Amino acid sequence: MVNTAVTLCGLPLENPVIPASGTFGYGYEFAQIYDINCLGTFSFKGTTLTPRYGNPTPRIAEYAGGLLNSVGLQNPGVEAVIREELPRLREVFHKPVMANVSGFSVEEYAQVCRQLDSEEQVGWLEVNISCPNVHGGGAAFGADPRTAAAVTRAVRDVTKKPVIMKLSPAAADIAAVARACQEAGADGVSLINTLPGMRIDLKRRRPLLANGTGGMSGPGIFPLAVRMVYQVYEAVSIPIVGMGGVSTAEDVLELMLAGATAVGVGAANLVEPRACRKIIQDLPVAMERYGIQQLTDIIGGAHHG
């Protein structure tokens, strides 16, 4: 009998499969399709201090290797999430959940995390530092180790919950950013977020997305995710949530060998709503095929002699 259990920042997971933020809503839509309590946990929709209506449509475009999205962090704001979304979520998901947090200043990140700190069902805070710093010329907080560390410290000061910093693949040196986050008090890191990309409509001769650019996700970015998880594992000693183009149980094993403790599944949920359930069902079979008894034994296994 194989063992799929892992521990993420001190909290146990039945398995390492985590639907990624922005691809799973607040869970209750998917709960109408299958019992989402089979998941390790999930990261709910990115939450900001005030409501955001998101970018104009169209927001989604396809490419051969996956999807481009430019949703623009549409969400009702942290107060409405606490008042309306979390009570509904509790009815369908009976495990700790991961709260994804976004902000446009260091203070804003801290305010949102402070408000979520008292929510019992929130097990982890996943802090998305791919957002533009409106006080720093618009560059993403995660593009530079110093700004990434500043956000990490500010969040660490206002919460006792495990803090997982979600890193941008656009950083010049993602391992240096991860190291800075660890030194500033992060309990874990998650990577990779989407990559900036664009498609152009040949008939209109204009970008397919109303916003012009969007985040690339899907199988086309998986090898990049594996490389970056591998690099970050060698730079830090805190757990990694690996993600980026995951669509099979074998992908989960590959990212864990690269160094991930848990694995996020994003675009696959938009293509097939039951994707995570299938990956979880397939995981024991894949483990047996490759002679893996316990998942924790293979974390970072590709680095060993």
What is the predicted role of each segment?
Residues P19, F42, V81, A99, ...:
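Conserved, mostly hydrophobic/aromatic
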Residues L67-L68, C131-R146, V177-E234, I238, ...:
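Glycine/Thr-rich beta-alpha phosphate-binding loop at enzyme active sites
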Residues P12-I18, F93-A99, V158-P169, Y233-M243:
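Short beta-strand/loop segments at the ligand-binding rim of alpha/beta enzyme cores
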Residues F24, N100-G103, L167-D173, F222, ...:
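Glycine-rich beta-to-alpha transition loops that act as phosphate-gripper elements at the mouths
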Residues F44-L49, I129-C131, G188-M198, G245-V246, ...:
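Glycine-rich phosphate-binding active-site loops on the catalytic face of alpha/beta enzymes
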Residues Y28-I33, Y109-E119, A171-A184, E234-V236, ...:
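Catalytic cores of alpha/beta
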Residues N55-A64, I200-G214, M256, A268-Q293:
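C-terminal helical cap(s) of enzyme catalytic domains, especially alpha/beta-barrels
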Residues M1-V97, S102-F104:
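N-terminal capping/small domains of soluble enzymes
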